[in-house]
């Protein structure tokens, strides 16, 4: 046994030594050429960037894929609400039905084509975990739908960046995560940027943007964060297929969305306030709008009015496109959390903020919700990118410290093993 343990320790030491020899060579090579060459610093930066990309190429490719899907998901979500924003509950429930059917079909195909060993996982019962995740997701979707009705595209992308400090706080409290000073600095820069943007916008007369609905959308980040943390805990303790997870969560979410209905009865939400007595009519009008293209609210509506004007013609095409990208988005989120962690997903998702803002500049992507570029947008993008880069630097430092600690621990174990072997 000691011989096998010693062999494993040797392999770990060799692997870690090779990686850190590569990093040390970058530093030593730079010291040789940096004194006499003005390009020494630039070469060192390029080599360090190349080393970072080479060691994490899979993560970056996955990030690009998730970025594209996530941006399209958010853009078509806004386009859907711009057409049928008066019927948020209807669109949410129909979307849940589509997700349930698609995920159940995918999981059925997976079980038929997979080996018998992987099917044993389906015998385990994760009912309460599925219910908790679905309840949190339902709360997130409903609250986000409400917030989006009076949140402009650019502000939407800005608010999504708040997920970084929100996830940091809850992961610190409940999952025991610890962070580097640069992580806190990066999150602080993002927070300051968001605060500055909201302050400027509060003095502007934007009838299609409401501070109250911005705050509602920010509040949706809390159940989203808890949902991601629950997924991480479940993935770490049990081996759950991500397709099955999404299928069961979508099924539960169809029913748990009913628990969030009282939100529509809050009187101060003037734009979407709907007493229980009018919900039946609203659901009927929403179904006719989505499936038959019949607009009901066409008078006394629009910018500055209590209700949005229905634009039901062709709304189902936009809605189906949104559902497709949302399904892909859910699968990628679960995969990233399963293979990495909640904070890895947070780092990847923070890139979508600037990307969404840019996407709203192009009419072929944003359609009727296209926005004109403003200086404030670019200043905000700079603040987000600066905060994101500093946050990533903190992660790199923490990863290096963790690997060095593991290397030292393996070295100590190897020495103890050799002593035990010699005394034996």
Curated annotation (Swiss-Prot):
Residues 1-56, 110-125, 178-180, 231-248, 339-346, 399-424 are cytoplasmic. It is a multi-pass membrane protein. Glycans are attached at residue 86. Its main location: membrane. GO terms for molecular function: xenobiotic transmembrane transporter activity. Disulfide bonds join 289-312, 301-309. The keyword Disulfide bond applies. Residues 78-88, 147-156, 202-209, 270-317, 368-377 are vacuolar. GO terms for cellular component: vacuolar membrane. Keywords: Amino-acid transport, Disulfide bond, Glycoprotein, Membrane, Transmembrane, Transmembrane helix, Transport, Vacuole. The chain crosses the membrane at residues 57-77, 89-109, 126-146, 157-177, 181-201, 210-230, 249-269, 318-338, 347-367, 378-398. It is found in: Vacuole membrane. The keyword ATP-binding does not apply. One of its GO terms (biological process) is amino acid transport. Nutrient transporter. Involved in maintaining the osmotic homeostasis of the digestive vacuole. Belongs to the CRT-like transporter family. PANTHER family: PROTEIN CLT2, CHLOROPLASTIC. This is Putative chloroquine resistance transporter. It comes from Plasmodium chabaudi. The gene is CRT.
């Amino acid at each position: 046994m000691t011989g096998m343990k010693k062999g494993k320790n040797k392999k770990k030491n060799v692997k870690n030594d090779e990686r850190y020899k590569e990093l040390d060579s970058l530093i030593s090579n730079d010291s040789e050429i940096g004194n006499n060459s003005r390009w020494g610093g630039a070469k060192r930066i390029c080599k360090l960037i190349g080393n970072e990309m080479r060691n994490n190429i899979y993560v970056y490719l996955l990030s690009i894929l998730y970025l594209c899907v996530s941006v399209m998901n958010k853009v078509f979500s806004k386009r859907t609400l711009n057409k049928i924003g008066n019927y948020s509950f209807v669109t949410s429930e129909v979307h849940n039905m589509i997700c349930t059917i698609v995920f159940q079909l995918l999981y059925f195909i997976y079980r038929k084509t997979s080996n018998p060993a992987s099917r044993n996982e389906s015998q385990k019962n994760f009912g309460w975990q599925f219910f908790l995740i679905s309840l949190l997701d339902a709360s997130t979707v409903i609250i986000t739908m409400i917030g989006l009705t009076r949140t402009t595209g650019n502000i939407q992308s800005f608010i999504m960046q708040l997920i970084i400090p929100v996830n940091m706080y809850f992961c610190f409290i409940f999952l025991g995560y610890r962070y580097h000073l640069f992580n806190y600095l990066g999150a602080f820069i993002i927070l300051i940027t968001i605060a500055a943007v909201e302050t400027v916008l509060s003095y502007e007369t934007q009838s299609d943007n409401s501070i109250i609905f911005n705050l509602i959308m920010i509040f949706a980040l809390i159940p989203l964060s808890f949902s991601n943390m629950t997924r991480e805990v479940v993935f770490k303790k049990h081996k759950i297929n991500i397709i099955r997870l999404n299928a069961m969560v979508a099924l539960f979410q169809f029913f748990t969305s009913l628990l969030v209905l009282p939100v529509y009865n809050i009187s101060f939400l003037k734009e979407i306030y709907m007493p229980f007595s009018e919900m039946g009519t609203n659901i009927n009008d929403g179904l006719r709008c989505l499936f038959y293209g019949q607009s009901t609210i066409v008078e006394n509506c629009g910018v500055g009015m209590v209700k949005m004007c229905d634009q039901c013609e062709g709304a189902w095409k936009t809605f189906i496109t949104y559902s497709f990208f949302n399904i892909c988005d859910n699968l990628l989120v679960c995969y990233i959390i399963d293979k990495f962690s909640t904070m890895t997903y947070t780092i990847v998702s923070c890139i979508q903020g600037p990307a969404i803002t840019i996407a709203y500049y192009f009419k072929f992507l944003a359609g009727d919700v296209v926005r004109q570029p403003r200086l404030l947008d670019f200043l905000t993008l700079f603040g987000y990118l600066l905060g994101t880069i500093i946050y990533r630097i903190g992660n790199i430092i923490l990863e290096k410290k963790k690997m060095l600690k593991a290397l030292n621990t393996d070295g100590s174990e190897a020495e103890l093993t050799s002593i035990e072997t010699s005394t034996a």
